[in-house]
């Protein structure tokens, strides 16, 4: 199984298709949290039919926006798709930038029990400093690792230890359901120059705005979905919604979406630089057509020798 990971706009999709064609029997499997949604074809940069070039693509646009997809559900789906590809004599090529999805598929998920809703509500109501102080008392190691400003992770660690009596780290050591030890993996992480990546993000947002993203969000808003659903919080949706309701100009909405995309790409870049195993190859150059073809050839050889 091949795996191509990296931040948004780094060229993963084009490389995945090139690899699939070089192999002759590749199937591209989506590992991006936004690209699962049917409602976000444009804003998620889901590959078009032309970009797919006849290569089979799986787990793209198969989830309705009214549903809240998650890593555990995606990993279950991905395991099924991977098994189907292998049974058909094809090579699955995982491609995406959602690190949590990839980590859950490969290494499993921590079997943390459901959190007591009263504990969750109490934890989420704590002021930032107080929450971090409480975590320092209940789980010193987590508090030392997480800064007070990392409010989401602080709250998660605190609610887990309060609700279960065990630290989140101890639960994570008991991960179950991963496939890393059952597949021969050929990974590649794309970490192109930051300036090149930022420019790509900005240009792509312009193309999205000019290519139907506004109509896409207008249709999404017309559904009257819960604003807390992931599809409603996807990058570009709130910004375009502000333009549509008159609280922002088109240029302001575009600039805000570009800024949000750059920030997201920066977080992804940092995650993929540090979190995957050191043995995973990193490609640190920008991607051109020639480089994509060369990478596909090299990755093909890696796949075939695993």
UniProtKB/Swiss-Prot annotation:
PANTHER family: TRNA DIMETHYLALLYLTRANSFERASE. One of its GO terms (molecular function) is ATP binding. This is tRNA dimethylallyltransferase. Monomer. The lineage of its organism: Bacteria, Pseudomonadati, Pseudomonadota, Alphaproteobacteria, Sphingomonadales. NCBIfam families: miaA. SUPFAM superfamilies: P-loop containing nucleoside triphosphate hydrolases. Catalyzes the transfer of a dimethylallyl group onto the adenine at position 37 in tRNAs that read codons beginning with uridine, leading to the formation of N6-(dimethylallyl)adenosine (i(6)A). It is an enzyme of class 2 (transferase).
């Amino acid at each position: 199984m091949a795996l191509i990971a990296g931040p948004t706009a780094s060229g993963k999709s084009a490389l995945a298709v090139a690899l699939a064609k070089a192999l002759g029997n590749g199937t591209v499997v989506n590992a991006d949290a936004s690209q699962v949604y049917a409602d976000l074809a444009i804003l998620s940069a889901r590959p078009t039919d032309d970009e797919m070039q006849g290569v089979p693509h799986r787990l793209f646009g198969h989830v309705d926006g009214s549903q809240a997809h998650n890593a555990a559900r995606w990993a279950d789906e991905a395991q099924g798709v991977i098994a189907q590809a292998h049974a058909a004599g094809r090579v699955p090529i995982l491609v995406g930038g959602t690190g949590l999805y990839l980590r859950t598929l490969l290494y499993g998920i921590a079997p943390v029990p459901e959190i007591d809703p009263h504990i969750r509500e109490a934890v989420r109501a704590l002021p930032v400093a107080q929450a971090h102080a409480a975590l320092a008392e209940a789980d010193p190691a987590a508090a030392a690792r997480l800064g007070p400003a990392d409010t989401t992770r602080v709250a998660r660690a605190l609610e887990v230890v309060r609700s279960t009596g065990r630290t989140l780290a101890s639960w994570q050591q008991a991960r179950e359901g991963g496939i890393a030890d059952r597949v021969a993996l050929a990974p590649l992480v794309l970490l192109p120059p930051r300036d090149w990546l930022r420019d790509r993000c900005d240009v792509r947002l312009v193309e999205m705005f000019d290519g139907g993203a506004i109509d896409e969000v207008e249709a999404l808003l017309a559904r009257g979905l819960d604003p807390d659903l992931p599809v409603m919080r996807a990058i570009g949706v709130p910004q375009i919604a502000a333009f549509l309701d008159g609280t922002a100009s088109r240029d302001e909405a575009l600039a805000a979406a570009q800024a949000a995309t750059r920030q997201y790409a920066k977080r992804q870049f940092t995650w993929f630089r540090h979190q995957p195993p050191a043995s995973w190859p990193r490609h640190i150059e920008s991607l051109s057509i020639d480089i994509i073809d060369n990478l596909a050839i090299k990755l093909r050889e890696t796949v075939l020798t695993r």
